[in-house]
A protein has these predicted regions:
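Glycan-recognition and catalytic cores of secretory/periplasmic carbohydrate-active enzymes
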Residues: 1-201
């Protein structure tokens, strides 16, 4: 619906979107507590910001802040000392898969957190989430987390940490294999959102 509104600027599209938010607000605590939403909040936070900027409806800001308070701290991940070696050297694929099944999406679980914080596309989504949180709380650290994280990841794992290694995980700096398109697309989107468009080309 938002894509239609951006393309056509029709009030009817915005009305449909506002009706959805009106419905969602009634179960917002459950939505904000969902493990997937907590791990990947960027799309929803960005949508709330855009709708708020257009409509000025205070409820949009309230929903965004409630959601932001429950999400994974991606700015902390992106600005902390990064994993400097390929993740495959820290844990085998079999062990990681078994751990993920056992934890069943628990963000506090060791393997779940390891998988998220060493996944190139997830880190790109996290960069956008940090930027959105920075817009909400005015934190310069969160606003700059995408650039800081990119510089650290690039230093230890090469361009776009998987974008040039055909591996969705942090895999070191070897650029000898093909391109992982999902990762390239995710980071290009993050660069544009973070005002780092020059990195996207």
């Amino acid at each position: 619906v938002w894509a239609l509104y951006e393309a056509e600027a029709k009030k009817e599209d915005l009305t449909v979107l506002l009706r959805w938010f009106q419905w969602a607000a009634k179960q917002w605590d459950d939505i904000a507590a969902d493990e997937y939403v907590r791990a990947f909040p960027a799309d929803l936070l960005e949508l709330l910001e855009k709708v708020y900027r257009i409509t000025g409806i205070p409820a949009m800001l309230k929903l965004a802040r409630t959601l932001s308070a429950s999400t994974m701290n991606w700015s902390g991940v992106l600005t902390a000392t990064p994993i400097q070696t390929p993740v495959s050297k820290a844990v085998s694929a079999e062990e990681l898969d078994a751990g993920l099944k056992k934890e069943n999406g628990d963000l506090e679980g060791y393997y779940t957190r390891l998988a998220l914080t060493t996944n190139a596309a997830a880190l790109a989504d996290g960069a956008r989430a940090a930027l959105a949180r920075g817009w909400l709380n005015g934190s310069a650290t969160e606003m700059n987390a995408a650039k800081t994280g990119w510089e650290k990841i690039s230093r230890y794992h090469g361009a776009i940490c998987g974008g040039l290694t055909a591996n969705p995980m942090l895999a070191g700096g070897n650029p000898s294999t093909g391109i992982f398109n999902d990762t390239l697309g995710a980071w290009a989107e993050a660069f544009v959102c973070a005002g780092m468009g020059a990195h996207a080309v």
